[in-house]
Amino acid sequence: MSAVQIFNTVHVNGSSPYDVHIGSGLNELIVQRAAESGAEQVAILHQPSMDDIASELDAALVAAGLKVLHLNVPDAENGKSLEVAGQCWDELGGAAFGRRDIVIGLGGGAATDLAGFVAAAWMRGVRVIQVPTTLLAMVDAAVGGKTGINTAAGKNLVGAFHEPDAVFIDTDRLATLPDAEIIAGSAEIIKTGFIADPEILRLYETDPAACLKKEVEGSHLPELIWRSVTVKGSVVGQDLKESSLREILNYGHTFAHAVELRENFRWRHGNAVAVGMMFIANLSHKLGLIDAPLLERHRSILAAIGLPTSYEGGAFDELYDGMTRDKKNRDGNIRFVALTAVGEVTRIEGPSKQDLQSAYEAISH
């Protein structure tokens, strides 16, 4: 294991407070946390692409006196199904996995979502440690306690709120990621900039290359991760179950989820969020909530790092149907998180279908 180095720790308040540790060489801390927890067994839920990292963690956990079970799941969103969750529960049952034992979610957002859901449901809730390895999972899926699986009706419609015991964000993993993963994950960071932290936007505008640099030296990514997690941690610490404030984290997500549903989840989530932010920015501009410079600021920041700013034309009816299924809707009205300025958030409730189509056409290609 490489030497442990902690860059930042974000404390998330709430009914079950926890810490998000951001640094490098964090396996030692993960093992220490599990060994001191009173657990007898640890179940590492991971995808095939994480086999090597899981084996390294396995050896360290065994050396610390813990029994280790591997929950091997399919890559990407294919693993977020009731069938796969059921297989995990069967394996936990076969291992006599108890209330004091711990699940570790190792991998991207799909793995951490599934690990959290499996842990939330097993014996009505066992502990989960999240170890995100993609940028998207680091700043979004692994933090906040939302867990879930997908169904034919939509993404994450079946799930639970289950806060992690701890989150370990190891920036050494960034160097192993394809450029496309760094770019896609950046969309969620940019989202937190628009809703709460203008410094994030300034960093992307002044040096976009440093915001994508995977090697830590000279990179803005560690600071961006810390800033984004700080925003999310502050929000979910006040509103775990999305009764009010937490909804602001869904900026750009109503249209994004419709895109993902239409694309059968083949689109990267971050790419869909980028297009979703362009959609809501255009709708907000049309309704007089934001000015033209803020609309253009969305486009320029996203485009500067290679995120999509438009979507396929001729798909409005399918996308509209997807938006009507969104979890945030109330009384049959489609609801959007919107801006009036950077850091100033409002809601749009029940916009006309004509206005929605106009916003869609503005980003169609």
Curated annotation (Swiss-Prot):
Binding positions for Zn(2+) per the UniProt entry: 188, 253, 269
EC numbers: 4.2.3.4
Principal cellular location given in the protein's record: cytoplasm
Cofactor: NAD(+); Co(2+); Zn(2+)
GO cellular component, one term: cytoplasm
Catalytic activity: 7-phospho-2-dehydro-3-deoxy-D-arabino-heptonate = 3-dehydroquinate + phosphate
Cofactor note text: Binds 1 divalent metal cation per subunit. Can use either Co(2+) or Zn(2+).
BP terms from Gene Ontology: amino acid biosynthetic process; aromatic amino acid family biosynthetic process; chorismate biosynthetic process
Pathway in which the depicted protein is active: Metabolic intermediate biosynthesis; chorismate biosynthesis; chorismate from D-erythrose 4-phosphate and phosphoenolpyruvate: step 2/7
GO molecular function: 3-dehydroquinate synthase activity; metal ion binding; nucleotide binding
Binding site for NAD(+): 75-80, 109-113, 133-134, 146, 155
SUPFAM superfamilies: Dehydroquinate synthase-like
A Pfam family assignment: DHQ_synthase
Record key words, sorted: Amino-acid biosynthesis, Aromatic amino acid biosynthesis, Cobalt, Cytoplasm, Lyase, Metal-binding, NAD, Nucleotide-binding, Zinc
Leader sequence residues: none
Compartments where located: Cytoplasm
Highest taxon above the source species: Bacteria
Group of enzyme by EC: lyase
Homology family: Belongs to the sugar phosphate cyclases superfamily. Dehydroquinate synthase family.
Annotated function: Catalyzes the conversion of 3-deoxy-D-arabino-heptulosonate 7-phosphate (DAHP) to dehydroquinate (DHQ).
Protein name per its UniProtKB record: 3-dehydroquinate synthase
Protein species of origin: Corynebacterium glutamicum (strain ATCC 13032 / DSM 20300 / JCM 1318 / BCRC 11384 / CCUG 27702 / LMG 3730 / NBRC 12168 / NCIMB 10025 / NRRL B-2784 / 534)
Gene, per the UniProt record: aroB
